[in-house]
A protein has these predicted regions:
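Solvent-exposed loop/turn and edge beta-strand elements of beta-rich ligand-binding domains
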Residues: 1-658
Length: 658
């Protein structure tokens, strides 16, 4: 992680009558995790003790910050009371304002209360030790709606001595920009202050200063030594325990992209807080993309651990990579953990044989919530490789049912080394997508030899050529297992767009679109679940989200939420989504009339620019273009009429002149 201060400046500004007014400078950037503040990049001061962390504990709490200092009355020419208006940088919120230092002849300068500012302005006060070593009380006002702050400073004396009649005011702001906190981007924040008269009517001077911040809130690591074929990874999420923006509906979700040669043990996932207490999390895993999603509590440092198996043969070296990042913010804001040359060894002699019968186990997992699934029946077939085809061996079959997500193949059916087994799901639980796939696994062994037998080598080569994850070579008996996932049907939501009057442009518009699931057609009450779909600039593919853990016997309703978080139930009314005017339409796939949905349905939510149809033209034109065209025609007619009248008048005058 890194932080930078760029573009910082100390500029002195003057009033119109030549009085030297004030200047703003960046003192530095820092992080605060509730225990200690750490300088990220020093500006004009690297002393972290100048940060009032006790004040932050009562306002914005943990996070990454920039600290600015405003020097008022440097030349000592100001007299009386003045206001300072603070424009908080976009993507930040005010942490606090405090009087930090008094010049020798400015000991009587204080902050004062103000009346009549309006309901949006809230008064704040803090007490901290200033740089003069005395307890200092500061009162200021903050308008969260406009993200502006005000402080009134009084009792200045114009002694006309440089810096002795001045005071320093510290302004500390916390980063709230999601692209910085979740996306890992660097952003320059511009702070602007305005010196005003006592009543705020006259703006006397302005000053500005900038600071750039960049700080990763995710980390990932692996141990220096490995336990055979497995690796235990550690993810540290929200390293500062700060309040981060939600990025998955009303949730905070991270994405962990496992390398293609890694097999996740989903039952090994554990999450704890910084004190070592277990934390409730939500998990989902996509076996097709080898991607894990974990939703975590906000405002907590969460430490997640899990193990993976590296699916490679022993005694060879390979690169292993595993990347974590925040959902909807791409790979840039995460941490890519790379092991450049992972390898492992089997026991001496090149054999893992303990008995003639390795024990095959099957795990059945709900991929949408990572819960074990019971009552699923699997058929197991003994097979052999015949040329380039796997064929079942007559009579070599058994079946069994999962309990707590696990089925262990037992006697009288016996499994052997160097033998292919086909695993196939027989029954699909209610509410889940049917899986007709066959999964193949072989546990290979050298049988106390220096190398595998030729037929075993052929099986390994055949499995390695397959491009999907339904073929597994287990190089040890401890790895002789399969994890098979089922996806819930749920209720699928697809996002669509109509961007022009002709209805021919369907390119996604960048932004985050939010959807709520309700149990009533009015969209009243709080949504049962909230999901989001995010498009970045340039993305064109169709995107979906899915509501899960639903009752198949209940009817539901899906509504997009507007910028105020309200369900859009009126499909003829223009609404604001992502600060753009749209008409939102809902269509249940296969049912063009009903808005009611049940488990297994797909809802297409279309955002359309509002258009009107011109019957005379038989085509669709945007209303604004139509009105503009009519206005242009009217203006042209008026101009032509004026020209005609002037011409007639001129002709008559010429005739009279003759």
């Amino acid at each position: 992680s890194s932080s930078t201060v760029s573009g910082s400046k100390t500029s002195t500004y003057y009033r119109s009558d030549g009085i030297k007014a004030f200047s703003l400078t960046v003192y530095g950037t820092f992080s605060y995790d509730g225990k200690e503040a750490k300088i990220l990049k020093a500006g004009t001061d690297s002393n972290i003790s100048k940060i009032s962390t006790k004040t932050l504990d009562t306002t914005t709490g943990h996070g990454i910050y920039a600290s600015w200092v405003l020097k008022v009355n440097y030349a000592g020419d100001l007299k009386g009371d003045y206001r300072v208006l603070e424009d908080i940088p976009e993507g930040m919120e005010l942490g606090y304002i405090r009087i930090k230092w008094h010049g020798n002849k400015a000991q009587s300068v204080v902050s004062k209360t103000m009346d009549g500012l309006g309901d949006d302005w809230k008064q704040y006060s803090n007490t901290a030790t200033n740089d003069n070593g005395r307890s200092q009380n500061t009162t200021y006002y903050y308008n969260k709606t406009t993200n502006k702050a005000l402080i009134k400073l009084g009792e200045f004396e114009n002694k006309h001595t440089r810096d002795e009649c001045s005071i320093d005011v510290q302004v500390v702001c916390r980063v709230t920009d999601s692209k910085v906190l979740l996306g890992g981007q660097s952003k320059t924040f511009a702070n602007k202050v305005t010196l005003q008269s006592n009543d705020g009517e006259e703006h006397l001077a302005t000053s500005s200063s900038t600071a750039a911040l960049e700080k990763n809130s995710l980390d990932k690591s692996h141990p220096e030594t490995f336990n055979g074929q497995t690796i235990k990874y550690t993810i540290t999420a929200n390293t500062l325990s700060q309040k981060l923006p939600s990025n998955d509906g009303n949730k905070l979700t991270l994405v962990d992209k496992l390398g293609d040669n890694l097999e996740l043990d989903i039952t090994s996932i554990e999450a704890k807080d910084d004190a070592g207490n277990s934390v409730q999390i939500e998990k989902a895993f996509n076996p097709e993309t080898n991607t894990l999603e974990i939703s975590i509590p906000n405002e907590k440092k969460i430490i997640i651990t899990y193990t993976v198996t590296v699916n490679i043969a022993p005694d060879i070296s390979t690169k292993v990579s595993n990347k974590v990042y925040w959902k909807s913010y791409g790979n840039d804001g995460g941490k890519n953990d790379v092991i450049p040359d992972f390898s492992y060894n089997l026991i001496a002699g090149g054999s893992t044989t303990t008995t003639d019968n390795p024990h095959l186990t099957i795990k059945k997992i709900d991929q949408d919530n990572a819960n074990p699934m019971s009552g699923v029946t699997f058929d197991i077939y003994e097979c052999k490789l015949n040329g380039d085809k796997i064929q079942r061996v007559e009579g070599g079959t058994t079946s069994g049912e999962t309990e707590n997500g696990l089925y262990a193949v037992q006697a009288p059916f016996v499994t052997y080394y160097n033998t292919i087994y086909e695993v196939k799901e027989r029954n699909t639980p209610d509410g889940y997508m049917k899986d007709d796939s066959s999964y193949y696994i072989i546990c290979v062994d050298k049988k106390n030899s220096d190398d595998y037998a030729d037929d075993v080598k052929q099986c390994i080569a055949y499995f390695d050529k397959q491009s999907n994850k339904k073929y597994k070579v287990a190089y040890s008996s401890t790895d002789f297992n399969l994890t098979i996932y089922n996806s819930q049907k749920g209720i699928l939501v697809k996002k669509a767009f109509i961007n022009n009057a002709m209805g021919t442009s369907h390119k996604p518009v960048s932004g985050t679109y939010t959807f709520g699931l309700y149990d009533n057609p009015q969209g009243s009450g709080s949504p049962l679940q909230v999901k989001t779909i995010t498009y970045s600039t340039g993305e064109t593919e169709e995107k979906y989200t899915k509501f899960i853990n639903l009752n198949p016997k209940i009817t539901y309703y899906v509504f997009e939420l507007d910028d105020e978080g309200r369900p859009i139930t009126n499909t003829s009314q223009e609404v604001t989504v992502n600060k753009l005017p749209y008409v939102v339409d809902y269509k249940v796939k296969g049912n063009s009339t009903s808005k009611a949905v049940v488990v297994g349905d797909e809802v297409i939510v279309t955002n359309s620019l509002r258009t009107k149809k011109l019957p005379s033209a038989g085509s669709r034109l945007t209303l604004i273009y139509r009105q503009l065209g009519l206005a242009m025609v009217g203006a042209s007619c008026t101009v032509l009429l004026i020209i005609y009248k002037n011409r007639v008048k001129k002709i008559k005058e010429e005739e009279i002149g003759k």
